[in-house]
C-alpha cells in the first residue's frame, strides 16, 4: 500500500505548470508583439499577420501588398481576419490563465482549476486554428526552410500548450489531497 506523496512533489509540479504558462506567454508576446506577427522575415520576403511583402524583380526591392492586392494574390480578407483573431485571441486567453491557477492552488478550488484548463484549451485550439488557417493561405510563398523566429516561437508555444493541458489533466487528483487550505499557499 502506497502512502501519500510528499507535498513538495505537488508544489514542484504546480510551480512547473506556472513556469510553463509564463514561458508560453513570453513566446507568444515575442512572436506576436516583438516580431510584429512576422512568420518569415528575410531580406527578400516578409510574411506575417500584418505584413505581406514580396520581392519585386523589376525594382529589386521588397514590395508590401495591402488588401485589394492581397485578394488578387489569393489571400481572402475574412480568412486573414479569422487567422488574426485566432492567434491574438489565444494570447489574450493565455494571459487570463495564471490567476485561476493560483486561486485553485491556494484555495483547493477545483472549479478555478477547470477554468484555467478551459482558458488554456481554448487558447490552444485558437492558436492552432489561426496559425493553420494563415499558413493555408500563404503556403505558396512560405516553405519549410523559411520560417523565422516568430513562427518557431508560435510553434513552440503550441507544443507547450499541449504539454500543459496533459500535465493539468493529471494534476487535479494530487491537488485535492492538501491537508488544509492555508497550508497549500
From Swiss-Prot:
Changing residue 112 to E: In a colorectal cancer sample; somatic mutation. Keywords: Glycoprotein, Membrane, Transmembrane, Transmembrane helix. Residues 1-11, 99-114, 172-185 are cytoplasmic. GO terms for cellular component: membrane. Its main location: membrane. Residues 33-77, 136-150 are extracellular. InterPro entries: TM140 (IPR028038). Glycans are attached at residue 38. It is a multi-pass membrane protein. This is Transmembrane protein 140. It comes from Homo sapiens (Human). The gene is TMEM140.
Amino acid at each position: 500500500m502506497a502512502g501519500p506523496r510528499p507535498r513538495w512533489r505537488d508544489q514542484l509540479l504546480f510551480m512547473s505548470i506556472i513556469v510553463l504558462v509564463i514561458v508560453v506567454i513570453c513566446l507568444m508576446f515575442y512572436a506576436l508583439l516583438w516580431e510584429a506577427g512576422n512568420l518569415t522575415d528575410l531580406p527578400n520576403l516578409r510574411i506575417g499577420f500584418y505584413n505581406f511583402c514580396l520581392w519585386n524583380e523589376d525594382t529589386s526591392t521588397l514590395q508590401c501588398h495591402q488588401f485589394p492586392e492581397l485578394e488578387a494574390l489569393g489571400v481572402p480578407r475574412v480568412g486573414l481576419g479569422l487567422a488574426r483573431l485566432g492567434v491574438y485571441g489565444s494570447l489574450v486567453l493565455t494571459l487570463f490563465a495564471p490567476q485561476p491557477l493560483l486561486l485553485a492552488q491556494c484555495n483547493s478550488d477545483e472549479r478555478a482549476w477547470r477554468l484555467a484548463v478551459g482558458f488554456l484549451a481554448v487558447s490552444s485550439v485558437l492558436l492552432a486554428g489561426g496559425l493553420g488557417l494563415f499558413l493555408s493561405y500563404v503556403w505558396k510563398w512560405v516553405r519549410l526552410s523559411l520560417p523565422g523566429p516568430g513562427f518557431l516561437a508560435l510553434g513552440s508555444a503550441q507544443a507547450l500548450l499541449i504539454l500543459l493541458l496533459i500535465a493539468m489533466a493529471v494534476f487535479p487528483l494530487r491537488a485535492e489531497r492538501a491537508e488544509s487550505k492555508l497550508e497549500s499557499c
